[in-house]
Amino acid sequence: MKRIAFLLCVISIALSCYAQNQTLDDYVSSVKEKSCAPIDYIFNLFENSDIVVIGERDHRDTTQYELILDLLKDPRFAQEVGYVYTEVGCVNRTKDVNKLLCGRYKSDKAFNDALYTYLRNEDFNPLWDKYNRVQFLRGLYEINRNSKHKITLGLTDCNFSWKRIKTAEEYKNFDDSPACAYRDSTMCLHFSKMYAKQKLKNGKRKALVITNHPHALNATFEGSDYHRQGKWLKERYGNDNVKIVMLNWTEYTNS
């Protein structure tokens, strides 16, 4: 009986691996057929569209930000686009983060001290422990430091300040507010206000939006007609003028 159970387990694993290999083969074939580097692919989208949305993988993933920083590091981004927006970060901290990213510091330690001081108040979560935020901001600072063309970062999440929160009840009231309950439209509203004020580059406004996969979808939320961020942007700025790029997704809870 134990042998039979073992054999069934081996067969199940083999079939699972075969299915995964089939899926992987499809991806490899597609990449070979397209024959275009990921960064060039995104810049090609910007040729005919003004807004490109990147559907971020799980917030804990760091490898995706290697790609994103390589994209921002490309001279074409600062010269032709110049603006990047993120889901993470309260909108009222936008001025502070750009001061951080364009500042001059005597040493790396001085920058890191300023970075961690800023991060303590960037978000409405008591602790945002995702290292890729440090990775992203530090990388963007290095890009700006080494280029005369600066990249501007826009933060799109709910307006929030820890200085205004004195009790648990006050925090709960914020967490239950419409702005938090309908974050997708909140983030879109904040984006649209900042986007309208962007300086023109080559006669146009271009923007890269980085938001988590569920928000980036061109769809409504299940069981409702409430738009996700991607769908809102497409309806606001035109289907062809907004392109959505989804990074491959992993269900961490099942791995």
Regions found by a protein language model. Name each.
Residues Y18-S255:
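Structured catalytic-domain cores with a bias toward divalent-metal coordination
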